[in-house]
Amino acid sequence: MGKIIGIDLGTTNSCVALMEGNQVKVIENSEGARTTPSIIAYMDDNEVLVGAPAKRQSVTNPKNTLYAVKRLIGRRFEEKEVQKDIGLMPYKIVKHDNGDAWVEAHGNKLAPSQVSAEVLRKMKKTAEDYLGEPVTEAVITVPAYFNDSQRQATKDAGRIAGLEVKRIINEPTAAALAFGLDKAEKGDRKIAVFDLGGGTFDISIIEIADVDGEKQFEVLSTNGDTFLGGEDFDQRIIDYIIGEFKKEQGVDLSKDVLALQRLKEAAEKAKIELSSGQQTEINLPYITADASGPKHLNLKITRAKLEALVEDLIERTIEPCRVAIKDAGVKVGEIDDVILVGGQTRMPKVQEKVKEFFGKDPRRDVNPDEAVAVGAAIQGQVLSGDRKDVLLLDVTPLSLGIETLGGVMTKMINKNTTIPTKHAQVYSTADDNQGAVTIKVFQGEREMAAGNKLLGEFNLEGIPPAPRGVPQIEVSFDIDANGILHVGAKDKATGKENRITIKANSGLSEAEIEKMVKDAEANAEEDHKLRELADARNQGDALVHSTKKALTEYGDKLEAGEKEKIEAALKDLEETLKNGSSDKAAIEAKIETVATASQKLGEKMYADMQAQGAAGAAGAAGGAGAAAGAEAAGASQQADDVVDAEFKEVKKD
């Protein structure tokens, strides 16, 4: 059985890790970095860039460069948070037929799950390159406060990327796993995981207990805000810069998409610099132009100014902390350790606020960017059966229930219930001779169902005629270890039953997922062909270069006819390569022609090398001879220092 990898699918950055024995390994991507920007760019030629290459070109291609898509995953287009993002994002957020929020690139509508799958595929490839074998299984993390739709959409993204998602695990819980297994402290400890990432905020209170040599991680409570994170901090800086520039120059940059993308980069950079320095300068020449000519932006921002701009955002993290402490039934003073997770927790003001609330310094020995992926990898090892000393008891973040008479939300499973869990309750009809009931399932804490998130609805039909209140309908809720809900309704008199896995009125249908999986597989096949074509072209280029070099040095030793034959074959190959031919067989045939024509040249070189005999000359000629000889024979090795850029074609519908 292959390894189960751990993936932290983040709003801003993603990370992949795996276990080697009892050691965890955070894997570097093809660019040599341990985290990968969660940015996907769709290019004019159908190429898809993921990570750092996508980020680098974002300024020139803002409308087709998608970032922070995790904020949209599993969300309805009408939700106020989505509506807010529509005005801020340079790319288009559109309404899908089922009411979900989708995105658009080059006129193609894409599901957030489909876009996130590109990042997951990059993580999968990163792990495969490291292991040298295929990877098919993963544990993927989500914010603890993600609802059912968002969890299901994340699972769908894994499937589209070609991964069997063995478990969806909450990010703070994963960080607690990474922290708890790394520390030698004995006895029971209560920890608070404060997770402020790129787009989401979570707070979890977790108890780590030693039970007969086994570490038991029990989540006591969780709370958060799935629309609060580093992206919002960046936006405050962007808004401030736009306001200052408008005051000075009279130009509104908020309408200029290219300028906005440059501002986003500058804001992120300034925010990072202000975590260590007291002041930073934003300098963006030629940010825009008007009738009077080009305009340049130069602005100093102090740490105090940044803190004033984001003060209310930091304050918004405190109320969830209060609720989590209350729900866990503990006092602030009983918390032994506070763990900071997520890049935004590097901001000194955030750390100060956390210290002020919990009354103690947060731990500094946890890597906020990697802890979540590490925890996911540990859970992967537990699920594969290779680790027996860890037990994880997670909770459902929000209450689940059904709508009953008068639009009331009747809770079936309360928030912070340990999962997996089951609960059944008997209900009856509201009218005489009612032949069917509609079960509407909601998630949330409001008293009235309409104030909560509708997860889905289904009917139980064929109820025998009877006065109201007589039929007995048993509704059962079953939450699995991924936090995903399965609901059933049964008429106890007839035994008629209807069971569903909640897949909201929204979400991707099975057919849509299958199509996206097939598209991804087709793209993988296309990638392979493109890779082979690139190899052939590189081989051709290298052969042209080495043969020309050899001709310059040794051409005068050949007969005129032989030299002309080589030159003609070279010209033919060069033209094919210059025309951008996508016929691999034709390129290989022309390489073979050059190789055959160059045999005499190779012989002359070796003869000359032997005749000279001197070590220096032998070395020089040997190098040239090897180049022409090996490639003339059609060898396909590429120069050691040539790295093929990853690229991928996406077919338009």
UniProtKB/Swiss-Prot annotation:
Keyword NAD: no
Region (Disordered) residue spans: 612-653
Keywords tagged on the record: ATP-binding, Chaperone, Nucleotide-binding, Phosphoprotein, Stress response
Biased composition (Low complexity): 627-639
Top-level taxonomic group: Bacteria
GO molecular function (one): ATP-dependent protein folding chaperone
Induction: By stress conditions e.g. heat shock.
Cited HAMAP family: DnaK
Family: Belongs to the heat shock protein 70 family.
Task of the protein: Acts as a chaperone.
Name of the protein described by the UniProt record: Chaperone protein DnaK
Organism: Paraburkholderia phymatum (strain DSM 17167 / CIP 108236 / LMG 21445 / STM815)
